[in-house]
Amino acid sequence: MTVSRLLKDRVRYAPYLKKVKPVEELIPLFKDGQYIGWSGFTGVGAPKAVPEALIKHVEENNLQGKLRFNLFVGASAGPEECKWAEHDMILRRAPHQVGKPIAKAINDGRIQFFDKHLSMFPQDLTYGYYSRNRTDGKILDYTIIEATAIKEDGSIVPGPSVGGSPEFISVSDKIIIEVNTATPSFEGLHDIDMPVNPPFRQPYPYTAVDQKNGLDSIPVDPERVVAVVESTQRDVVGPNTPSDATSQSIARHLVEFFENEVRHGRLPENLHPLQSGIGNIANAVIEGLTDSSFKNLTVWTEVLQDSFLDLFENGALDYATATSIRLTEAGFQKFFDNWDDFSKKLCLRSQVVSNNPELIRRLGVIAMNTPVEVDIYAHANSTNVSGSRMLNGLGGSADFLRNAKLSIMHAPAARPTKTDPTGISTIVPMASHVDQTEHDLDVLVTDQGLADLRGLSPRERAREIIKNCAHPDYQPILTDYLDRSEHYAKLHKCMHEPHMLKNAFKFHLNLSEKGTMKVDNWD
Protein backbone atom coordinates (compact mmCIF):
# COMPACT_ATOMS: atom_id res chain seq x y z
CA MET A 1 0.00 0.00 0.00
CA THR A 2 1.24 3.50 -0.87
CA VAL A 3 1.92 5.58 2.23
CA SER A 4 1.19 9.30 1.91
CA ARG A 5 3.91 11.85 2.55
CA LEU A 6 1.90 13.33 5.41
CA LEU A 7 1.63 9.93 7.09
CA LYS A 8 5.36 9.27 6.66
CA ASP A 9 6.10 12.60 8.34
CA ARG A 10 3.90 11.73 11.33
CA VAL A 11 5.03 8.10 11.80
CA ARG A 12 8.64 8.28 12.97
CA TYR A 13 8.83 4.61 14.00
CA ALA A 14 9.75 2.86 10.75
CA PRO A 15 8.36 -0.64 11.55
CA TYR A 16 4.85 0.85 11.79
CA LEU A 17 5.01 1.98 8.17
CA LYS A 18 4.93 -1.71 7.23
CA LYS A 19 1.66 -2.03 9.15
CA VAL A 20 -0.16 0.73 7.27
CA LYS A 21 -3.33 -0.76 5.80
CA PRO A 22 -6.44 0.42 4.00
CA VAL A 23 -9.27 0.53 6.48
CA GLU A 24 -11.33 -1.99 4.49
CA GLU A 25 -8.80 -4.73 5.24
CA LEU A 26 -9.52 -4.43 8.96
CA ILE A 27 -13.22 -5.31 8.77
CA PRO A 28 -12.70 -9.11 9.16
CA LEU A 29 -10.98 -8.50 12.51
CA PHE A 30 -14.25 -7.44 14.12
CA LYS A 31 -16.72 -10.01 15.45
CA ASP A 32 -20.07 -9.76 17.18
CA GLY A 33 -19.81 -9.37 20.97
CA GLN A 34 -16.22 -8.12 21.10
CA TYR A 35 -15.01 -5.66 23.74
CA ILE A 36 -13.74 -2.50 22.06
CA GLY A 37 -11.97 0.55 23.47
CA TRP A 38 -11.90 3.92 21.73
CA SER A 39 -9.81 6.96 22.41
CA GLY A 40 -11.69 10.23 22.80
CA PHE A 41 -13.30 12.43 25.41
CA THR A 42 -16.24 14.85 25.03
CA GLY A 43 -16.46 14.37 21.29
CA VAL A 44 -12.83 15.00 20.31
CA GLY A 45 -9.87 12.69 19.76
CA ALA A 46 -11.99 9.63 18.95
CA PRO A 47 -11.24 7.29 16.02
CA LYS A 48 -13.12 8.02 12.82
CA ALA A 49 -11.93 5.93 9.87
CA VAL A 50 -12.40 2.45 11.36
CA PRO A 51 -15.79 3.15 13.00
CA GLU A 52 -17.06 4.68 9.73
CA ALA A 53 -15.83 1.67 7.74
CA LEU A 54 -17.68 -0.66 10.09
CA ILE A 55 -20.86 1.39 9.67
CA LYS A 56 -20.55 1.06 5.89
CA HIS A 57 -19.98 -2.70 6.25
CA VAL A 58 -23.11 -3.08 8.39
CA GLU A 59 -25.20 -1.02 5.97
CA GLU A 60 -24.07 -2.90 2.87
CA ASN A 61 -24.58 -6.33 4.43
CA ASN A 62 -27.75 -5.68 6.46
CA LEU A 63 -25.97 -6.55 9.69
CA GLN A 64 -27.93 -4.19 11.93
CA GLY A 65 -28.29 -5.95 15.30
CA LYS A 66 -25.97 -8.75 14.16
CA LEU A 67 -22.61 -7.04 14.64
CA ARG A 68 -22.74 -5.47 18.10
CA PHE A 69 -19.94 -4.44 20.42
CA ASN A 70 -19.28 -3.69 24.06
CA LEU A 71 -17.97 -0.16 23.61
CA PHE A 72 -15.83 1.64 26.17
CA VAL A 73 -14.68 5.25 25.77
CA GLY A 74 -13.23 7.63 28.36
CA ALA A 75 -16.41 9.70 28.16
CA SER A 76 -18.45 10.66 25.09
CA ALA A 77 -17.04 10.04 21.61
CA GLY A 78 -17.81 11.78 18.33
CA PRO A 79 -20.78 11.43 15.96
CA GLU A 80 -19.59 7.93 15.03
CA GLU A 81 -20.98 6.43 18.24
CA CYS A 82 -24.39 7.90 17.45
CA LYS A 83 -24.24 6.26 14.00
CA TRP A 84 -23.28 2.98 15.69
CA ALA A 85 -26.37 3.34 17.89
CA GLU A 86 -28.57 4.06 14.86
CA HIS A 87 -27.27 0.88 13.21
CA ASP A 88 -27.78 -1.20 16.37
CA MET A 89 -24.05 -1.83 16.70
CA ILE A 90 -23.70 -1.22 20.45
CA LEU A 91 -24.51 -3.97 22.91
CA ARG A 92 -23.11 -2.27 26.01
CA ARG A 93 -21.74 1.24 26.58
CA ALA A 94 -19.93 3.02 29.40
CA PRO A 95 -19.37 5.42 31.13
CA HIS A 96 -20.78 8.58 29.46
CA GLN A 97 -22.42 9.45 26.16
CA VAL A 98 -23.86 12.44 24.33
CA GLY A 99 -26.26 12.35 21.41
CA LYS A 100 -29.96 11.75 20.82
CA PRO A 101 -29.61 8.42 18.92
CA ILE A 102 -27.54 6.73 21.61
CA ALA A 103 -29.64 8.16 24.46
CA LYS A 104 -32.78 6.95 22.67
CA ALA A 105 -31.34 3.46 22.28
CA ILE A 106 -30.45 3.39 25.98
CA ASN A 107 -33.90 4.52 27.06
CA ASP A 108 -35.55 2.11 24.60
CA GLY A 109 -33.63 -0.67 26.34
CA ARG A 110 -31.54 -1.61 23.27
CA ILE A 111 -28.19 -0.61 24.81
CA GLN A 112 -27.08 -1.72 28.26
CA PHE A 113 -25.51 1.46 29.63
CA PHE A 114 -23.82 2.12 32.93
CA ASP A 115 -22.28 5.36 34.07
CA LYS A 116 -19.40 5.60 36.49
CA HIS A 117 -17.23 8.27 38.09
CA LEU A 118 -14.80 9.19 35.32
CA SER A 119 -11.83 9.07 37.69
CA MET A 120 -12.63 5.44 38.48
CA PHE A 121 -13.83 4.04 35.16
CA PRO A 122 -10.46 3.42 33.43
CA GLN A 123 -8.84 1.84 36.49
CA ASP A 124 -11.86 -0.38 37.15
CA LEU A 125 -11.68 -1.54 33.55
CA THR A 126 -8.01 -2.52 34.03
CA TYR A 127 -9.03 -4.50 37.14
CA GLY A 128 -11.20 -6.67 34.88
CA TYR A 129 -14.44 -5.58 36.54
CA TYR A 130 -16.24 -5.03 33.22
CA SER A 131 -15.06 -8.22 31.54
CA ARG A 132 -15.43 -10.65 34.45
CA ASN A 133 -17.88 -12.85 32.52
CA ARG A 134 -15.34 -13.57 29.77
CA THR A 135 -13.80 -17.02 29.72
CA ASP A 136 -10.70 -16.16 27.68
CA GLY A 137 -9.09 -13.88 30.28
CA LYS A 138 -9.07 -10.85 27.97
CA ILE A 139 -10.29 -7.38 28.93
CA LEU A 140 -10.41 -5.58 25.57
CA ASP A 141 -10.15 -7.29 22.19
CA TYR A 142 -9.18 -4.11 20.34
CA THR A 143 -8.43 -0.52 21.20
CA ILE A 144 -8.75 1.93 18.32
CA ILE A 145 -6.81 5.05 19.18
CA GLU A 146 -6.40 8.30 17.31
CA ALA A 147 -2.85 9.67 17.20
CA THR A 148 -1.50 12.90 15.79
CA ALA A 149 2.06 11.52 15.68
CA ILE A 150 4.06 8.39 16.49
CA LYS A 151 7.46 8.92 18.06
CA GLU A 152 10.73 7.12 17.27
CA ASP A 153 10.10 4.56 20.04
CA GLY A 154 6.64 3.69 18.72
CA SER A 155 4.79 5.58 21.44
CA ILE A 156 1.58 7.40 20.57
CA VAL A 157 1.07 11.16 20.67
CA PRO A 158 -2.67 11.69 21.21
CA GLY A 159 -4.69 14.56 19.82
CA PRO A 160 -6.98 16.98 21.66
CA SER A 161 -7.91 14.45 24.36
CA VAL A 162 -6.28 11.78 26.50
CA GLY A 163 -9.22 10.34 28.45
CA GLY A 164 -8.83 6.64 29.23
CA SER A 165 -6.48 5.81 26.35
CA PRO A 166 -3.45 4.88 28.50
CA GLU A 167 -5.49 2.35 30.47
CA PHE A 168 -7.23 0.95 27.38
CA ILE A 169 -3.90 0.41 25.63
CA SER A 170 -2.39 -1.25 28.68
CA VAL A 171 -5.03 -4.02 28.74
CA SER A 172 -5.95 -4.36 25.06
CA ASP A 173 -5.15 -7.59 23.24
CA LYS A 174 -4.63 -5.78 19.93
CA ILE A 175 -4.30 -2.11 19.01
CA ILE A 176 -5.21 -0.18 15.87
CA ILE A 177 -3.73 3.29 15.50
CA GLU A 178 -5.49 5.93 13.41
CA VAL A 179 -3.00 8.66 12.59
CA ASN A 180 -4.95 11.83 11.88
CA THR A 181 -3.06 13.84 9.28
CA ALA A 182 -5.86 16.38 8.87
CA THR A 183 -5.08 18.00 12.22
CA PRO A 184 -1.72 19.37 13.37
CA SER A 185 0.35 17.29 15.76
CA PHE A 186 -0.32 17.92 19.46
CA GLU A 187 3.15 16.75 20.45
CA GLY A 188 4.43 18.41 23.62
CA LEU A 189 1.00 19.13 25.07
CA HIS A 190 0.49 15.93 27.07
CA ASP A 191 1.56 14.62 30.45
CA ILE A 192 0.77 10.91 30.66
CA ASP A 193 0.79 8.83 33.83
CA MET A 194 0.62 5.16 32.92
CA PRO A 195 -1.57 2.93 35.10
CA VAL A 196 -0.06 1.11 38.07
CA ASN A 197 -2.40 -1.10 40.09
CA PRO A 198 -2.43 -1.47 43.87
CA PRO A 199 -0.48 -2.28 45.96
CA PHE A 200 2.30 -0.80 43.82
CA ARG A 201 0.64 2.53 43.03
CA GLN A 202 2.49 5.68 44.11
CA PRO A 203 0.99 9.12 44.88
CA TYR A 204 0.58 11.49 41.95
CA PRO A 205 3.24 14.14 42.71
CA TYR A 206 1.40 17.23 41.48
CA THR A 207 1.12 20.17 43.88
CA ALA A 208 0.46 22.87 41.27
CA VAL A 209 -1.64 23.06 38.12
CA ASP A 210 1.36 23.55 35.83
CA GLN A 211 3.51 20.68 37.13
CA LYS A 212 4.46 17.90 34.74
CA ASN A 213 5.95 14.61 35.83
CA GLY A 214 4.74 12.03 33.32
CA LEU A 215 5.45 11.10 29.71
CA ASP A 216 4.62 13.20 26.67
CA SER A 217 3.28 10.17 24.77
CA ILE A 218 1.59 6.83 25.46
CA PRO A 219 3.93 3.79 25.43
CA VAL A 220 2.70 0.77 23.50
CA ASP A 221 4.03 -2.70 22.79
CA PRO A 222 4.65 -2.67 19.00
CA GLU A 223 3.86 -6.40 18.84
CA ARG A 224 0.25 -5.66 19.79
CA VAL A 225 -0.19 -3.02 17.09
CA VAL A 226 -1.89 -4.87 14.23
CA ALA A 227 -2.51 -1.93 11.90
CA VAL A 228 -1.91 1.74 11.28
CA VAL A 229 -4.59 3.65 9.36
CA GLU A 230 -4.47 7.18 8.02
CA SER A 231 -7.39 9.35 9.08
CA THR A 232 -8.12 12.56 7.21
CA GLN A 233 -11.14 13.91 9.08
CA ARG A 234 -10.94 16.59 11.75
CA ASP A 235 -13.08 16.61 14.86
CA VAL A 236 -16.44 18.27 14.29
CA VAL A 237 -17.73 20.22 17.29
CA GLY A 238 -20.91 22.22 16.91
CA PRO A 239 -21.13 25.87 17.92
CA ASN A 240 -21.28 26.54 21.64
CA THR A 241 -24.65 27.47 23.05
CA PRO A 242 -24.44 31.23 23.54
CA SER A 243 -25.02 32.70 26.96
CA ASP A 244 -28.39 34.32 27.58
CA ALA A 245 -29.93 36.54 30.25
CA THR A 246 -30.54 33.57 32.55
CA SER A 247 -27.00 32.19 32.38
CA GLN A 248 -25.52 35.69 32.62
CA SER A 249 -27.51 36.28 35.80
CA ILE A 250 -26.11 33.05 37.27
CA ALA A 251 -22.60 34.18 36.33
CA ARG A 252 -23.10 37.55 38.04
CA HIS A 253 -24.22 35.87 41.27
CA LEU A 254 -21.15 33.63 41.18
CA VAL A 255 -18.67 36.42 40.49
CA GLU A 256 -20.17 38.45 43.35
CA PHE A 257 -19.86 35.41 45.62
CA PHE A 258 -16.19 34.96 44.70
CA GLU A 259 -15.51 38.65 45.33
CA ASN A 260 -17.14 38.36 48.75
CA GLU A 261 -15.10 35.26 49.61
CA VAL A 262 -11.92 37.16 48.72
CA ARG A 263 -12.96 40.14 50.87
CA HIS A 264 -13.49 37.83 53.84
CA GLY A 265 -10.18 36.03 53.36
CA ARG A 266 -11.66 32.66 52.47
CA LEU A 267 -10.20 32.76 48.96
CA PRO A 268 -7.01 34.35 47.61
CA GLU A 269 -7.27 37.14 45.05
CA ASN A 270 -6.59 34.72 42.20
CA LEU A 271 -9.10 32.24 43.67
CA HIS A 272 -8.18 28.54 43.50
CA PRO A 273 -8.01 26.31 40.41
CA LEU A 274 -11.35 26.35 38.62
CA GLN A 275 -13.31 23.40 37.26
CA SER A 276 -16.21 24.11 34.96
CA GLY A 277 -18.50 21.85 32.97
CA ILE A 278 -19.80 22.48 29.46
CA GLY A 279 -22.90 24.28 28.23
CA ASN A 280 -24.19 27.83 28.11
CA ILE A 281 -24.10 28.35 31.89
CA ALA A 282 -20.48 27.22 32.08
CA ASN A 283 -19.66 29.51 29.15
CA ALA A 284 -21.43 32.42 30.84
CA VAL A 285 -19.45 31.86 34.04
CA ILE A 286 -16.17 31.94 32.12
CA GLU A 287 -17.35 35.04 30.26
CA GLY A 288 -18.18 36.61 33.63
CA LEU A 289 -14.68 35.87 34.88
CA THR A 290 -13.24 37.29 31.65
CA ASP A 291 -15.01 40.58 32.36
CA SER A 292 -14.17 40.57 36.09
CA SER A 293 -11.15 41.93 37.93
CA PHE A 294 -9.75 38.47 38.71
CA LYS A 295 -6.25 37.83 37.35
CA ASN A 296 -3.64 35.05 37.48
CA LEU A 297 -6.36 32.41 37.44
CA THR A 298 -5.65 28.72 37.00
CA VAL A 299 -7.84 25.87 35.79
CA TRP A 300 -7.89 22.18 36.75
CA THR A 301 -10.77 20.64 34.86
CA GLU A 302 -11.95 17.91 32.49
CA VAL A 303 -12.75 19.93 29.39
CA LEU A 304 -11.66 23.27 27.96
CA GLN A 305 -14.02 25.15 25.64
CA ASP A 306 -13.59 28.19 23.41
CA SER A 307 -14.36 30.60 26.24
CA PHE A 308 -11.14 29.61 28.01
CA LEU A 309 -9.14 30.89 25.05
CA ASP A 310 -10.61 34.34 25.73
CA LEU A 311 -9.41 34.08 29.34
CA PHE A 312 -5.93 33.26 28.06
CA GLU A 313 -5.97 36.12 25.55
CA ASN A 314 -7.00 38.82 28.01
CA GLY A 315 -4.28 37.74 30.44
CA ALA A 316 -6.62 36.59 33.22
CA LEU A 317 -5.72 32.88 32.93
CA ASP A 318 -2.16 31.75 33.67
CA TYR A 319 -2.40 27.98 33.16
CA ALA A 320 -4.96 25.23 32.51
CA THR A 321 -4.94 21.47 32.92
CA ALA A 322 -7.62 19.23 31.38
CA THR A 323 -8.05 15.87 29.72
CA SER A 324 -9.75 17.32 26.62
CA ILE A 325 -9.78 20.49 24.52
CA ARG A 326 -13.25 20.58 23.02
CA LEU A 327 -13.10 23.50 20.63
CA THR A 328 -15.28 24.56 17.73
CA GLU A 329 -13.74 24.81 14.27
CA ALA A 330 -13.06 28.50 14.87
CA GLY A 331 -11.69 27.72 18.32
CA PHE A 332 -9.27 25.11 17.01
CA GLN A 333 -8.14 27.52 14.29
CA LYS A 334 -7.44 30.19 16.90
CA PHE A 335 -5.64 27.59 19.01
CA PHE A 336 -3.39 26.45 16.15
CA ASP A 337 -2.73 30.02 14.97
CA ASN A 338 -1.47 30.86 18.46
CA TRP A 339 0.15 27.49 19.23
CA ASP A 340 3.40 28.92 20.61
CA ASP A 341 1.51 30.98 23.18
CA PHE A 342 -1.32 28.61 24.14
CA SER A 343 0.80 25.44 24.26
CA LYS A 344 3.00 26.92 27.01
CA LYS A 345 -0.04 27.43 29.23
CA LEU A 346 -1.85 24.16 28.73
CA CYS A 347 -1.46 20.50 29.67
CA LEU A 348 -3.57 17.49 28.72
CA ARG A 349 -3.55 14.60 31.22
CA SER A 350 -5.23 11.23 31.64
CA GLN A 351 -8.76 11.44 33.06
CA VAL A 352 -7.68 9.42 36.11
CA VAL A 353 -5.37 12.37 36.90
CA SER A 354 -7.54 15.31 35.83
CA ASN A 355 -10.42 13.86 37.87
CA ASN A 356 -8.37 12.37 40.69
CA PRO A 357 -10.13 13.05 44.02
CA GLU A 358 -6.92 13.40 46.02
CA LEU A 359 -5.48 15.95 43.59
CA ILE A 360 -8.74 17.90 43.47
CA ARG A 361 -8.72 18.13 47.26
CA ARG A 362 -4.98 18.91 47.46
CA LEU A 363 -5.23 21.77 44.97
CA GLY A 364 -8.40 23.21 46.53
CA VAL A 365 -10.34 23.19 43.28
CA ILE A 366 -13.51 25.27 42.91
CA ALA A 367 -15.99 22.96 41.16
CA MET A 368 -18.98 24.24 39.16
CA ASN A 369 -21.46 21.87 37.51
CA THR A 370 -25.05 21.86 36.23
CA PRO A 371 -27.69 19.47 37.61
CA VAL A 372 -31.03 18.29 36.26
CA GLU A 373 -32.70 19.14 39.56
CA VAL A 374 -31.88 19.82 43.20
CA ASP A 375 -34.22 19.19 46.10
CA ILE A 376 -34.90 21.51 49.01
CA TYR A 377 -32.28 19.74 51.14
CA ALA A 378 -29.56 19.95 48.42
CA HIS A 379 -29.57 16.44 47.00
CA ALA A 380 -28.79 16.76 43.29
CA ASN A 381 -29.81 14.72 40.26
CA SER A 382 -27.39 15.02 37.34
CA THR A 383 -28.47 12.12 35.15
CA ASN A 384 -32.04 10.80 35.15
CA VAL A 385 -35.02 12.95 34.18
CA SER A 386 -37.98 12.12 36.43
CA GLY A 387 -35.84 9.43 37.97
CA SER A 388 -35.80 7.13 34.93
CA ARG A 389 -34.81 8.72 31.61
CA MET A 390 -31.04 8.79 31.15
CA LEU A 391 -29.53 11.93 29.69
CA ASN A 392 -25.75 11.56 29.34
CA GLY A 393 -24.35 9.99 32.49
CA LEU A 394 -22.69 11.08 35.70
CA GLY A 395 -19.45 12.18 34.08
CA GLY A 396 -16.93 13.74 36.40
CA SER A 397 -19.28 15.96 38.36
CA ALA A 398 -19.14 13.83 41.51
CA ASP A 399 -15.35 13.45 41.26
CA PHE A 400 -15.12 17.20 41.64
CA LEU A 401 -18.12 18.03 43.83
CA ARG A 402 -17.28 15.48 46.51
CA ASN A 403 -13.66 16.64 46.78
CA ALA A 404 -13.52 20.33 45.84
CA LYS A 405 -12.78 23.12 48.30
CA LEU A 406 -15.92 24.81 47.03
CA SER A 407 -18.63 22.62 45.48
CA ILE A 408 -21.06 24.69 43.41
CA MET A 409 -24.05 23.71 41.30
CA HIS A 410 -25.74 26.15 38.94
CA ALA A 411 -28.93 25.92 36.89
CA PRO A 412 -31.86 28.04 35.72
CA ALA A 413 -34.56 28.22 38.38
CA ALA A 414 -37.19 27.01 35.92
CA ARG A 415 -37.38 25.51 32.43
CA PRO A 416 -40.22 25.55 29.90
CA THR A 417 -42.56 22.76 28.88
CA LYS A 418 -44.74 22.73 25.76
CA THR A 419 -47.59 24.39 27.66
CA ASP A 420 -45.92 26.35 30.46
CA PRO A 421 -42.89 28.67 30.14
CA THR A 422 -41.91 27.87 33.74
CA GLY A 423 -43.39 24.38 33.85
CA ILE A 424 -40.30 22.64 35.25
CA SER A 425 -38.81 23.76 38.55
CA THR A 426 -35.15 22.96 39.12
CA ILE A 427 -35.86 23.05 42.87
CA VAL A 428 -38.12 20.13 43.84
CA PRO A 429 -39.34 18.71 47.17
CA MET A 430 -37.38 15.48 46.73
CA ALA A 431 -34.91 14.64 43.96
CA SER A 432 -36.23 11.82 41.77
CA HIS A 433 -32.69 10.42 41.51
CA VAL A 434 -29.63 11.30 43.60
CA ASP A 435 -26.11 11.59 42.19
CA GLN A 436 -24.70 14.17 44.62
CA THR A 437 -25.90 14.08 48.20
CA GLU A 438 -26.65 16.92 50.61
CA HIS A 439 -23.17 16.33 52.04
CA ASP A 440 -21.47 17.25 48.74
CA LEU A 441 -22.82 20.72 47.92
CA ASP A 442 -21.64 24.03 49.36
CA VAL A 443 -23.35 26.53 47.10
CA LEU A 444 -26.41 26.47 44.84
CA VAL A 445 -26.97 29.18 42.23
CA THR A 446 -29.85 29.94 39.90
CA ASP A 447 -30.77 33.06 37.96
CA GLN A 448 -32.87 34.03 41.00
CA GLY A 449 -29.97 34.09 43.45
CA LEU A 450 -27.35 32.18 45.40
CA ALA A 451 -27.75 29.97 48.46
CA ASP A 452 -24.66 29.49 50.63
CA LEU A 453 -25.33 26.13 52.30
CA ARG A 454 -22.11 25.75 54.26
CA GLY A 455 -22.71 24.76 57.86
CA LEU A 456 -26.50 24.83 57.63
CA SER A 457 -28.84 22.17 58.98
CA PRO A 458 -31.23 20.54 56.48
CA ARG A 459 -34.18 22.73 57.48
CA GLU A 460 -32.02 25.86 57.29
CA ARG A 461 -30.81 24.77 53.85
CA ALA A 462 -34.37 24.28 52.67
CA ARG A 463 -35.42 27.83 53.64
CA GLU A 464 -32.30 29.30 52.05
CA ILE A 465 -32.73 27.37 48.80
CA ILE A 466 -36.43 28.21 48.45
CA LYS A 467 -35.88 31.89 49.29
CA ASN A 468 -32.82 32.48 47.10
CA CYS A 469 -32.93 29.91 44.29
CA ALA A 470 -36.50 28.81 43.56
CA HIS A 471 -38.45 30.56 40.81
CA PRO A 472 -41.09 32.97 42.19
CA ASP A 473 -43.82 30.78 40.66
CA TYR A 474 -42.68 27.92 42.89
CA GLN A 475 -41.60 29.67 46.09
CA PRO A 476 -45.05 29.61 47.75
CA ILE A 477 -45.69 26.02 46.63
CA LEU A 478 -42.36 24.80 48.01
CA THR A 479 -42.74 26.82 51.21
CA ASP A 480 -46.17 25.25 51.75
CA TYR A 481 -44.67 21.79 51.25
CA LEU A 482 -41.93 22.52 53.78
CA ASP A 483 -44.36 23.99 56.33
CA ARG A 484 -46.65 20.98 56.08
CA SER A 485 -43.72 18.58 56.25
CA GLU A 486 -42.41 20.27 59.39
CA HIS A 487 -45.86 20.12 61.00
CA TYR A 488 -46.11 16.41 60.25
CA ALA A 489 -42.52 15.73 61.36
CA LYS A 490 -43.00 17.58 64.64
CA LEU A 491 -45.95 15.36 65.51
CA HIS A 492 -43.86 12.26 64.80
CA LYS A 493 -40.62 13.59 66.33
CA CYS A 494 -38.59 13.37 63.09
CA MET A 495 -37.70 17.01 62.52
CA HIS A 496 -34.19 16.59 61.13
CA GLU A 497 -35.17 16.44 57.45
CA PRO A 498 -38.97 16.67 57.18
CA HIS A 499 -40.83 15.15 54.25
CA MET A 500 -44.35 14.16 53.31
CA LEU A 501 -43.54 10.95 51.47
CA LYS A 502 -47.01 10.69 49.93
CA ASN A 503 -46.39 14.06 48.22
CA ALA A 504 -42.62 14.04 47.77
CA PHE A 505 -42.81 13.36 44.02
CA LYS A 506 -46.03 15.24 43.31
CA PHE A 507 -44.11 17.78 41.20
CA HIS A 508 -42.96 14.99 38.88
CA LEU A 509 -46.36 13.29 38.74
CA ASN A 510 -48.08 16.58 37.97
CA LEU A 511 -45.54 17.26 35.20
CA SER A 512 -46.28 13.87 33.64
CA GLU A 513 -50.05 14.29 33.86
CA LYS A 514 -50.55 18.02 33.27
CA GLY A 515 -47.36 19.32 31.65
CA THR A 516 -46.35 21.48 34.62
CA MET A 517 -44.91 21.05 38.10
CA LYS A 518 -47.29 23.68 39.50
CA VAL A 519 -49.42 21.54 41.78
CA ASP A 520 -52.79 22.94 42.83
CA ASN A 521 -52.41 21.84 46.44
CA TRP A 522 -50.75 19.25 48.70
CA ASP A 523 -54.00 17.64 49.92
Swiss-Prot record:
Source organism per entry reads Kluyveromyces lactis (strain ATCC 8585 / CBS 2359 / DSM 70799 / NBRC 1267 / NRRL Y-1140 / WM37) (Yeast)
> What GO terms are given for molecular function?
acetate CoA-transferase activity; acetyl-CoA hydrolase activity
Keyword Hydrolase attributed: yes
The enzyme's first-digit EC class, named in words, is hydrolase
Which residues are annotated as active site? E302 (5-glutamyl coenzyme a thioester intermediate)
Asked whether the keyword Cytoplasm is assigned, the reply is yes
Q: Which gene encodes it?
A: ACH1
Gene3D superfamilies recorded for this chain? 4-hydroxybutyrate coenzyme like domains, Acetyl-CoA hydrolase/transferase C-terminal domain, Glutaconate Coenzyme A-transferase
EC assignment: 3.1.2.1
The record lists CoA as bound by G277, I278, G279, N280, I281, N392, G396
InterPro entries named among the record's database cross-references:
AcetylCoA_hyd_C (IPR026888), AcetylCoA_hyd_C_sf (IPR038460), ActCoA_hydro (IPR046433), ActCoA_hydro_N (IPR003702), NagB/RpiA_transferase-like (IPR037171)
- Which family is it part of? Belongs to the acetyl-CoA hydrolase/transferase family.
Q: Name one GO biological process term.
A: acetate metabolic process
Catalyzes what?
acetyl-CoA + H2O = acetate + CoA + H(+)
Biological function: Presumably involved in regulating the intracellular acetyl-CoA pool for fatty acid and cholesterol synthesis and fatty acid oxidation.
* Cell location: Cytoplasm
One GO cellular component from the entry? mitochondrion
Q: What is this protein called?
A: Acetyl-CoA hydrolase
UniProt entry keywords in alphabetical sequence: Cytoplasm, Hydrolase
Lineage, opening ranks = Eukaryota, Fungi, Dikarya, Ascomycota, Saccharomycotina
